[in-house]
Each structure stands twice: as C-alpha cells, then as structure tokens.
C-alpha cells in the first residue's frame, strides 16, 4: 500500500442517494494503517502473427487478486447500512456526512482479451497505416454480502453505483488511419465504448426527461494533422540540425454529446468514461 492509502485524509462534497432523497454531503476519506500488501496470480496466453507489414495479436489474460486495495464507495456504504458507523446524521436524522477509507478486498478476479491488428500499404507516394486495438472485458468478480452469504458478482457491463468500484463497459475499441508523406502525417481516429446498465432506480420525472437504465454506447471521431515546419523554414541559414513540427487536431469531430447517466442528484454523465465538452480544437 502507498503512504496516501495508509495515512492520508481528504474531504470533498459529493452526492449520494439516502433512504428517501438525494443530497450533497461531506465525504471524508481517511487512510487505513492496517492495510495488507495485495497479491495476485497472473495468467496470460497470447498469439502474435506478422507478415509483410501485417500484424495480428491476441492476448487472453486473467488476474486473481488477494487483498486487492480498493477505496470504499460512499454510496455503497450508505446502501449497505444507512445508520452504520461510517454514516453521520444530525439530531433530526438528516444525513450530513459519510466517512470512507481504503480496505483489502478478500478476493477479486479479472479476465479479458486484448487484440490488435495493423497493416501498412503504399499509397500515392506515401504510406497508409491502419491500426485496430481493442479490449473485451470478460469478468470483474468482486464479493458481495447477501442473505445466502458472500457471493462473487460480475461487475462487467454495469455502472456499479452500489459497489466499491466504477463503471465497467465490456468492450473498448480504438482504430487509427494514418497517412504519412514527406514527413507529414494525417490521422483519423475512432474511439468506441460499449454501453452499460445502470441499476439505480429512476424516478418518473427523470424518465419523462429521457433518462433510462441503459447508458448508451459512444463512438467519437478525431482528426489531426502533423506538419514538419523545419522542412520549410531555415534558422540562421542552417538546415537539417533541428526538427520543428506543429500539430493541429479536432477532438470529437462531429460534436457528439456524452451519453446521459442518471446518478441523482447529478443529472449528468459518467466522468470516468465520457467527456461532456464536445468538439475541441488543439494546436501544438
């Protein structure tokens, strides 16, 4: 464990769903000096094939954790026991604070598949490169207390608002098309993210506003242009002894909105996965 996980102290405001309402409250996170080191058994099986500028890769992986260190979720603590020792209420019973810490999760099992494809072809006195990279998350098993004891729950494909983890879409795929010519580079990038389930109860008002229990998938396109300025500009009548480039890009080319997530009282988006800022231009 890190020094921060063992001895830190942090306070912020955050939203949680109480017994009958959603409120912003003080959320404190303190260190846990009794943390144990995490241990894991890793298993990998991979194949790589390459020929004449083509490359295909496949990698199955599994990680079996013991005592994985995780930060507690204020919402999960409140859902498990609304009047527990980590919950602070005033004399009227109103929620005013939740205190979280770090803990050792007894068992966690992760598995998935990483895959990739790349190829390079000559095109109009230049070179076209196609790259595809993806991850398929098969399982993310964590323990959950139930009436029948502790059971392992697969968190993949869920928002996981009620667990000590975060949203885990099943598939992520990125593709890149690059055209290179005379030290210039033109790129088109596509970023895909699977949709996932939000099991939080949605009010009738929120339903009327278009919120639902499925967070939509996301497909974002970016473009960029990289130019070698030093190829056209000389400094002190010298050339070839420096490399000067500029890069111009548009992120979220078609100005796609972030998928809506009902996470009362924040009618918002999933900040871990999506960016609500829309189209952006960058110059480097």
PLM region spans:
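Residues on the lipid-exposed face of transmembrane beta-strands in outer-membrane beta-barrel proteins
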Residues: 45-49, 115-119, 132, 175-179, ...
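Outer-membrane beta-barrel signature, preferentially recognizing the C-terminal barrel domain
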Residues: 1-57, 64, 90-113, 118-123, ...
């Amino acid at each position: 464990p890190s020094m921060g996980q063992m001895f830190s102290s942090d306070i912020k405001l955050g939203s949680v769903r109480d017994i009958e309402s959603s409120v912003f409250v003080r959320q404190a996170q303190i260190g846990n000096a009794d943390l144990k080191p995490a241990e894991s058994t890793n298993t990998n099986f991979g194949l790589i094939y390459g020929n004449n500028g083509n490359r295909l890769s496949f990698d199955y992986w599994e990680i079996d954790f013991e005592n994985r260190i995780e930060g507690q979720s204020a919402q999960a603590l409140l859902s498990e026991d609304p009047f527990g020792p980590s919950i602070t209420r005033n004399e009227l019973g109103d929620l005013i604070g939740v205190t979280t810490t770090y803990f050792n999760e007894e068992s966690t099992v992760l598995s998935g598949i990483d895959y990739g494809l790349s190829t390079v072809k000559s095109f109009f006195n230049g070179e076209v490169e196609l790259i595809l990279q993806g991850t398929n998350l098969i399982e993310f098993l964590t323990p959950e207390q139930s009436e029948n004891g502790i059971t392992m729950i697969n968190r993949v494909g869920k928002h996981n608002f009620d667990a000590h983890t975060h949203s885990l879409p099943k598939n992520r795929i990125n593709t890149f098309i690059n055209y290179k010519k005379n030290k210039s580079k033109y790129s088109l990038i596509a970023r895909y993210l699977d949709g996932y389930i939000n099991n939080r109860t949605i009010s009738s008002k929120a339903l009327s506003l278009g919120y639902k229990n499925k967070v939509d998938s996301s497909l974002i396109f970016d473009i960029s242009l990289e130019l070698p300025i030093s190829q056209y500009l000389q400094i002190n009548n010298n050339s070839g002894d420096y490399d000067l480039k500029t890069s111009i890009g548009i992120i979220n080319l078609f100005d796609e909105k972030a998928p809506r997530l009902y996470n009362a009282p924040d009618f918002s988006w999933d900040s871990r996965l999506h960016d609500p800022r829309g189209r952006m231009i960058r110059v480097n």
